[in-house]
Amino acid sequence: MLEKVFDINQIFDEKGIMTLKRFGWDGSVAFQNHTDFSDELIDNAKKYGEENGILVYSGLKILSNNQNEIDKIVKKYRNRVEMIFIEGGDIKINRKTLESNETDVLSTPELNRADNGLDHVLTRLGSTNRVSIELNLSNLIKNKNYDRARVLWAFQRNLMLCKKYDTPVVISSGANDIYGIKAPDDVRGFLNTLVDQMYAKKIMETTSKIVNYRLHMKKSNVLMYGLEIVE
């Protein structure tokens, strides 16, 4: 039986959040791009979640090829959101993301590349720093013909590497409206075509575990992972 399963998307409206609940998701990480982040938008989404019995958390996706800028953005938002994603594709950004345990997810490492965006060295970095690799269904679906086959191949290659080196993996619908939302059973069914069922289950549960970890780290008595003030 699955533990809590959270989708990763850009759903902020009440109808969309109700659809996520109806489809069977326990929670949602609604991410905004760093260029247009709005506290009001995510606060309203969290309110809709409370009213409809589904957990809604805040995510931030960083879209930048400037490593110094990325550091500044992560520092600015780390305590304001539950998950930080960095859009990959550029091999230097892929490495930068996987070297930092202050980020949570390397998003689309294969973006605009002829290869999968990862190798053994980078995957080991993700394992060491517990940075997840994202499988973005929206990126897969929006591509066609050869490009879709290339993204699917990248998924398969990255899954093989991540399983070998115990690097966490998340899967996201990436939906920005109700038509892009997928039911968790359908998402797991897709994963079952790529990996064994137990590994698919592990991937489905990873997003909620990241959120729980970040919520724990925000507690005032937690100085660092494994070190807490006990009164």
Curated annotation (Swiss-Prot):
Reaction catalyzed: Endonucleolytic cleavage of RNA, removing 5'-extranucleotides from tRNA precursor
Record GO terms (molecular function): ribonuclease P activity
Enzyme class: hydrolase
GO biological process, any: tRNA 5'-leader removal
Chief localisation class: cytoplasm
UniProt cross-references to SUPFAM superfamilies, sorted A to Z: PHP domain-like
Keywords for the protein's UniProt record, in alphabetical order: Cytoplasm, Endonuclease, Hydrolase, Nuclease, tRNA processing
EC code: 3.1.26.5
Residues spanning the membrane: none
Subcellular location: Cytoplasm
One Gene Ontology cellular component: cytoplasm
Keyword Hydrolase: yes
Key word Nuclease present: yes
Assembly behavior: Consists of a catalytic RNA component and at least 4-5 protein subunits.
Primary role: Part of ribonuclease P, a protein complex that generates mature tRNA molecules by cleaving their 5'-ends.
Protein family (similarity comment): Belongs to the eukaryotic/archaeal RNase P protein component 3 family.
The name this protein goes by in its record: Ribonuclease P protein component 3
Organism: Methanococcus vannielii (strain ATCC 35089 / DSM 1224 / JCM 13029 / OCM 148 / SB)
Gene, per the UniProt record: rnp3
